[in-house]
Amino acid sequence: MEEHRKRHGRRLDYEEKKRKRTAREAHKASADAQKIFGHKAKLHHARRHAEKVQMKKTLKAHDERNVKQKDDGAVKEGALPAYLLDRDGQKDAKALSSAVKDRRKDRAAKYSVPLPKVRGIAEEEMFKVIKTGKSKSKSWKRMVNKATFVGEGFTRKPVKLERFIRPMGLRMTKANVTHPELKTTFQLPILGVKKNPQSPLYTSLGVLTKGTILEVNVSELGMVTTGGKVVWSKYAQITNNPENDGCINSVLLV
């Protein structure tokens, strides 16, 4: 075949046919994925899930490639104030990370919260039943109707294993946090959901409803402890209904 190709060349429409065949591959793979079932389907979806996770990691690595990294050697000894020393160096960053993790373990109940009581939310209001299967006869999946928070490195489970679906349009990453003493509002990144008063399940899903205790990043506010350390995160309680307003309003717990 190689010899014949060298002597006579290719068909005139070879490149066009090859382009069309490549373009059809995605559609063919999609059709095959919808037809297969049983053990073969599980293997196929597991393989595709692994490919997508790897692709996501590769894209993230490409995005971070052009980000300028801070040079630790550029800052001379004594050039920074004492309360900013925790932000420099791998050793100090690790200590700060450990402090944040320890703080997350603290009970949210020790604060006197602005909203001590909230109304209960029925399961029918919280979840929408999703019919699945070829004849739409299975109803074990649920879609969350409320605003949610998922972490930055969140990856969805394979379709056959994902019970709770959290829509992209209802995922929140920032909250409007009001300082009760300063009477000032800041837009701060959310670090996690500490406690949802409705149910532990909603806490694990990261559902954001009225009265939920959030953990927000307050490093930009320049708050310092009595020991001179920068405060990295603090708790805040949601005071509105995010699914109705499209934003999160909360009060900082100081």
Swiss-Prot record:
Motif Nuclear localization signal: positions: 5-12
GO biological process, any: maturation of 5.8S rRNA from tricistronic rRNA transcript (SSU-rRNA, 5.8S rRNA, LSU-rRNA)
UniProt keyword annotation of Ribonucleoprotein present: yes
Chief place of localization: nucleus
Region annotation (Disordered) ranges: 1-73
Gene Ontology CC terms: nucleolus; preribosome, large subunit precursor
Extent of Basic and acidic residues compositional bias: 11-30, 60-73
Keyword terms, alphabetized: Nucleus, Ribonucleoprotein, Ribosome biogenesis, rRNA processing
Compositionally biased tracts (Basic residues): 1-10, 37-59
Pfam family, one: Ribosomal_S8e
Transmembrane segments: none
Keyword Protease: no
Taxonomic superkingdom: Eukaryota
Localization (cell): Nucleus, Nucleolus
Similarity annotation: Belongs to the eukaryotic ribosomal protein eS8 family. Ribosome biogenesis protein NSA2 subfamily.
Physiological role: Involved in the biogenesis of the 60S ribosomal subunit. May play a part in the quality control of pre-60S particles.
SUBUNIT field: Component of the pre-66S ribosomal particle. Interacts with NOP7 and RRP1. Interacts with RSA4 (via WD repeats).
PANTHER family the UniProt entry points to: RIBOSOME BIOGENESIS PROTEIN NSA2 HOMOLOG (PTHR12642)
Protein name as annotated: Ribosome biogenesis protein NSA2
